[in-house]
C-alpha cells in the first residue's frame, strides 16, 4: 500500500479563511473539537478499517459537513477538503459541479448516510492510473 496523505488541521483552517474571503460568509471556528474529530475520522478509518480512497474521501465529506465546526462555509470546506485529500493521493472525482453541489446539500440536510456518500465517491473516483489509460 502506498503512503496516504492527509490535510492538516492548519491547512484546513487556512483553506476555510480563503473560501470565506472568496465566496463570502462569516469567519470563525465554532467548535474546534468537532473539527478535530471530523478530520481524524478518515485517519482512524485508515488505521482500523480500510485504505480505500473513495471511502476515506467520503469520510471527510460526510463528517466535515455534519460537524458544523465553522460559523459558516461547512459544506464548502467539506467539498474542498475531501477533493484535496483525493488530489494529495493522486485521485479525483469525475462528477459535475452540479452533482457535487447536490451531494453536499443532501449530506448537510441528512438525506444521505455515510455509506450513501461512500457509494457516490466509489462511483465517481478516478485514480492517477485510471486517468492515464
Which functions belong to the PLM regions below?
Residues 1-133:
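FIC/Doc superfamily catalytic core
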